[in-house]
Amino acid sequence: MPLGTTLWYYHKVEFIESQPFTRKLHRLADDGADQVLRAIQQDLERKPDRGAMVPGLGCVRKARIANPGRGKGKRGGYRYLYLYLETRQHIHLLLLLDKNEQEDASEEQRKQIRHWAAQLKRDAGD
């Protein structure tokens, strides 16, 4: 009897960081930037749609991640806004906020995010 073969495909998502996200990550987390980024990636690899949709931002989601330097858990940590494009398995990390500095995106940031989201979805065919 021939040996059967079963193929399993594990869908990994690709992460794309915006320049504002990366700059803010390195400014806020400094030496812990890689640790924070990896924690975000692990959370989103497990459940890409985990964050709550932000009204008016074109399918952009907002989630929380702990600040390892503060030791206060997710509530006292960072907020990040991202766009998950399921058809392409892309997650665009758009903005990172420190709760102590800014809890929500400013109107100017929201305008930029709406523009990015529309452009990214259009480019992806979503």
Located regions from the model:
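Enriched for short, Lys/Arg-rich terminal
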Residues: 3, 83-126
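Solvent-exposed amphipathic alpha-helical surface segments
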Residues: 28, 47, 120-124
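Generic solvent-exposed, charged/amphipathic alpha-helical segments
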Residues: 26, 41-45, 114
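Arg/Lys-rich, positively charged N-terminal/basic patches that mediate binding to nucleic acids
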Residues: 1-39
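Basic/aromatic recognition patch in beta-strand/loop cores that engages polyanionic ligands
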Residues: 50-96, 101
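Compact soluble domain cores
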Residues: 32-52
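Amphipathic alpha-helical interface surfaces
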Residues: 17, 36, 40, 74-77, ...
